[in-house]
């Protein structure tokens, strides 16, 4: 299923079951507190301008704003997510576009964040070049993602293929992600290879185990989920 079609179909169900922040690893139960930890990890301060690429229904944007940020912009490809975001907060600055075709209108940002959206882009070189070009001098990129385990065995490789079919998402290893951004001259200066140790993943576990209505829509055949939550700060 195409990314746009997937989120047009399922975003309302995600919002109902998991709230406004659709992420596998949560640093705190409430979006405001989760985003405060993200701010610390991404070295974001209230004076910064932030761009959220693949912003969902704006949950992270709202969390950042509740922690004092004023200049937050989001981009999503899903019309359904735009509508749901407007219901959460009519004043959210969310723009509907394929990010690779998005018109930045000359805007530049102190921080650009991608939360579990990096693997949706088919041309990573073009994505990374676009992101880097949108940074202000001294700007940084924060990525929170589901990364493939390194050196997967045959069963794990099969699981990754099943996930690709299900989500149309590429799960890169932490080493691959770090290398890809390094090719654009960006160095990893922060992050954790395994966020499961310091976050709550119970909602995600229930989801992939088929213990929720939304999970049962997704996981009738996936045998293994050889991924881990990781985050990266690139400068």
Per-region residue spans from a language model:
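N-terminal, positively charged/glycine-rich alpha-helical extensions of SAM-dependent methyltransferases
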Residues: 1-21
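Conserved alpha-helix/loop element of class I SAM-dependent methyltransferases that forms part
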Residues: 28-46
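Class I SAM-dependent methyltransferase SAM/SAH-binding core
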Residues: 57-101
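A short acidic, Gly/Pro-enriched loop at the edge of an enzyme's catalytic core
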Residues: 101-112
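A short glycine-rich, Lys/Arg-flanked "PGG" loop and its adjoining helix->strand segment in the class I
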Residues: 125-137
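Conserved beta-strand signature within the Rossmann-like core of class I S-adenosyl-L-methionine
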Residues: 139-145
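Short, glycine-/aromatic-enriched active-site segment of Class I SAM-dependent methyltransferases
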Residues: 147-168
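Short alpha-helix
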Residues: 170-185
């Amino acid at each position: 299923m195409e990314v746009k079609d997937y989120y047009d179909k399922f975003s309302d169900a995600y919002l109902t079951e998991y709230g406004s922040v659709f992420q596998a690893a949560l640093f705190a139960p409430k979006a405001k507190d989760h985003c405060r930890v993200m701010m610390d990890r991404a070295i974001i301060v209230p004076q910064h301008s932030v761009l959220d690429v693949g912003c969902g229904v704006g949950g992270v944007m709202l969390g950042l704003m509740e922690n004092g940020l004023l200049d937050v912009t989001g981009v999503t490809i899903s019309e359904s997510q735009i509508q749901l975001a407007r219901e959460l907060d009519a004043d959210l600055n969310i723009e509907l576009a394929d990010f690779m075709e998005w018109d930045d209108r000359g805007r530049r940002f102190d921080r650009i964040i991608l939360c579990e959206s990096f693997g949706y882009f088919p041309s990573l070189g073009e994505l990374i070049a676009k992101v880097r070009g949108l940074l202000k001098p001294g700007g940084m990129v924060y990525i929170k993602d589901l990364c493939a385990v390194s050196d997967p065995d045959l069963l794990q490789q099969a699981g990754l293929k099943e996930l690709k079919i299900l989500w149309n998402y590429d799960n890169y290893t932490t080493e691959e992600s770090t290398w890809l951004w390094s090719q654009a001259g960006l160095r990893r200066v922060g992050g954790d290879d395994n966020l499961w140790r310091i976050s709550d993943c119970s909602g995600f576990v229930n989801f992939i185990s088929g213990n929720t209505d939304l999970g049962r829509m997704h996981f009738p055949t996936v045998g293994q989920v050889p991924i881990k939550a990781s985050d990266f700060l690139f400068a």
